[in-house]
């Protein structure tokens, strides 16, 4: 997942992937030291077990996404970015409506906005899906028609098997398309 705080990432994950993917987020360990390293270790372990994983973090920059892309590549699995392209103003409004620990300090929201770079396949993603807000009210509905999907970039279905454009070699194995 890629998107600012309060863009709707967790909501999107809950509605689209929670039943089929293990959700991993640094937010699961708010007080832990080395949360980034822990997250990377957990993702690598889950992928090694053959599990499907979704990382629910802001992941705003190429540099912040690179370690997870490398982990997926090492596990010979496709990696898709779902980018919630929601305006900063909308994220601020949603964040202002949050209470307690769910509310992100504005400095954090603005810092992430300053680092935000839309993901591309050039980074190593197999696919990039863009999800946009509808009238500032949330992300596009899951059941959007084909024309809406093409025109607005709604969430795509899971990556089809065999869609990896590269050959993956594991030690002691034959090439896998």
List each language-model region with its residue ranges:
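Conserved substrate/cofactor phosphate-moiety recognition/catalytic segment
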Residues: 7-64
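Hydrophobic anchor at the beta1->P-loop junction of P-loop NTPases
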Residues: 1
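Catalytic phosphate/metal-binding cores of nucleic-acid and nucleotide-processing enzymes, i.e., regions
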Residues: 14-15, 26, 46-49, 66, ...
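Conserved GTP-binding G-domain of TRAFAC-class P-loop NTPases and closely related GTPase folds
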Residues: 89-177
């Amino acid at each position: 997942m890629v998107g600012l705080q309060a863009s709707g990432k967790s909501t999107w994950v809950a509605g689209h992937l929670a039943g089929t993917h293990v959700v991993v987020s640094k937010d699961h360990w708010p007080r832990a030291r080395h949360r980034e390293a822990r997250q990377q270790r957990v993702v690598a372990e889950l992928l090694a077990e053959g599990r499907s994983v979704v990382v629910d973090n802001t992941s705003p920059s190429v540099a912040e996404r690179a370690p997870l892309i490398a982990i997926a590549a090492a596990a010979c699995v496709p990696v898709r970015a779902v980018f919630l392209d929601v305006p900063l103003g909308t994220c601020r409004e949603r964040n202002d409506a949050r209470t307690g620990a769910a509310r992100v300090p504005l400095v954090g929201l603005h810092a992430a906005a300053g680092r935000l770079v839309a993901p591309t396949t050039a980074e190593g993603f197999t696919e990039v899906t863009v999800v946009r807000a509808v009238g500032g009210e949330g992300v596009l509905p899951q059941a959007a028609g084909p024309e809406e999907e093409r025109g607005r970039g709604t969430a795509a279905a899971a990556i089809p098997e065999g869609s990896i454009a590269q050959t993956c070699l594991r030690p002691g194995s034959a090439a896998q398309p």
